[in-house]
Amino acid sequence: QRQMCIRDSGDVEQLTNVPILGELPLCGHKSSDKGTIVVRENKNDMMEETFRGLRTNLLFMLRKDQKVILFSSTQPGEGKSFVTGNLAVSLAYLGKKVVVVGMDIRKPGLNKVFDLSKRQEGISNYLMDPEDKDLFDLVQPSGISPNLDILLGGTIPPNPTELVARDTLEKAIEQLKSRYDYVLLDTAPIGMVTDTAIISRVADMCVYVCRADVTPKAAFCYINVLRDEHKFDKLAVVI
């Protein structure tokens, strides 16, 4: 089984020429811990360092006017929400205004990462009813840094794919861009539902997360399809 999975950056480099933003050390945090934010202010451990390096590489790849970063992966359990959340915290500590948006509307992973309850309204409530909902009323402070806010996925709608296909999504993202330096979208695994491919239209960059000994090599190769279809202006991998 393990031969079939990605083991390290060497494997990734054999499978694709998409640049690698960084390789995270294995995290000792059990998922039962309160949230899984490991980046803390003024703390220098290996995880911290790695996310700082990740942040530097990310900012280097983005042009000044590129603010929207989409995070995806091949399948669930690859650490996509973990990477999104911690990179967001790292950017916030750099003094950037950041909002993380839970676009994996079917299975909200951000709630776990930030230790928030599942039953709150979020982006889906705005997309369903943009006339009556104020988007910024649905945004909540992260409680971690004053620079970081969270916009959860919200109520699970009967038709997530149709919902994210509406041009209301563009309107929502434009509003967020007017108030934040960076908008991070935590989306569904791209191999599983079409939502993420549809959401790609509002993103400047895709960070594709894979996990050592979890992500199958065959499935990971889908990243080359994303590269060849030019769905994203920029594309990079985190292991």
Regions found by a protein language model. Give the residues of each.
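Structured cytosolic domains appended to multi-pass membrane proteins
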Residues: 105, 150-152
